[in-house]
Amino acid sequence: MGDWLLNLPVLWMAVVVFAATYLLAASIYWIVTRLAVNDRARAFKSVSPGMLPPLGILFALLVGFIAVEVWNSYEKAKVAVATEASALRSVVLLAGTFPEEQKARINALVDRHIEVAVNEGWPAMARRKLTLSTLPTSLIEALRVTLELKPADDSQRIAQSEMVKAIHAAADARRQRIVISQSAVGTVKWAGILLMGLCTLVAIAMVHSDNRLACAIALTLFATGIALSLLLIAAYSRPFTGEISVRPDLLKQVITSGQPSSNP
């Protein structure tokens, strides 16, 4: 689906999806009922109603498999952001064991990494433009500064080792969210859902072509199911795009500038 649709608020996305689906169902109803005369009417009625359950099951399976894939990607994106935020928070806390100057330098680099991620990384991920070739320069610099620290005692040596691990964990989580941001429901999958839904709507219209009211009711009910399925998949299809997307709120909570150094 187009970026313009996926970036709409969910309410407007629902309006577009439901309107398009109902328009398609109405078109099928009009075409089939107009064609259902004389020999064609008998041919339409020869279509076995037993076809409808298999078609409905196939549509449900397609939707189910794609929905599971989409929602798994969304959950993985949330976990990646939470892991990155947790690792960066560990760096900030462990930096407190070192002198103020070194602590402030590391905190400033962590803040800069988060600000770049929020202000540049998230918009780029929403457009699926951020790639692994974009290096986290602030995080790399924080790792270099951490490795250059001269521990004065065992506690600082342990803190330095844990900080290195936390920075590596943050970098790995960043890579994960970038990879996940590239995920999307492919054109073939969208085409499969739409074609399966179209075939089912046509079959419903043909089976009920001799009773226009029953035909209209059946088409409306199934079209509603199609629209709802498409809406749910579209709303979650890109983890970092649209109104329902993974936000950088957890990362923002790690920013140290302007925050008290300890709990009240």
Question: Language-model segments: which ranges?
Answer:
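Short, Lys/Arg-rich, polar N-terminal cytosolic tail immediately upstream
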Residues: 1-4
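Alpha-helical transmembrane anchor segments
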Residues: 6-26, 30-36, 179-264
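Membrane-interface segments at loop-to-transmembrane junctions
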Residues: 40-51
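A generic, lipid-embedded transmembrane alpha helix
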Residues: 49-66
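Short extracytoplasmic/periplasmic juxtamembrane "stem" segments immediately C-terminal to an N-terminal membrane anchor
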Residues: 80-97, 247-261
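Structured inter-helical modules in multipass membrane proteins
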Residues: 90-182
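Transmembrane signal-anchor/signal-peptide helices with a preference for the extracytoplasmic
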Residues: 61-82, 237
